[in-house]
Amino acid sequence: MLVKNIIRALRAERGWSQAALADQLGVSRQSVNAIETGKYDPSLPLAFAIARLFEKSIEEIFDDETEARLAAQ
């Protein structure tokens, strides 16, 4: 599972739209869309904000090993 899919899945679990997530992060809906589609890598402060918001460690969302482990499941 790629980072973009992890964020999309976490957002969907909570029933949040891209706009709702964007509002909580203080970014545009287009930024959330770009992250979810892999067109944009979030800045470090934004990555930490995403992890905090979803109550996950940054490694759970953005770590390459996490992606490989989830893809193998």
Locate predicted features.
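Short linear/disordered segments characteristic of secreted peptide precursors
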Residues: R8, P42, E65-A68
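DNA major-groove recognition helix of helix-turn-helix/homeodomain DNA-binding modules
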Residues: P45-E60
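Short basic helix-loop element that most often maps to the first helix and adjoining turn
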Residues: N5-Q24
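Short, charged recognition helix plus adjacent turn
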Residues: R52, F62-Q73
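Recognition helix of helix-turn-helix/homeodomain-like DNA-binding domains
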Residues: V27-Y40
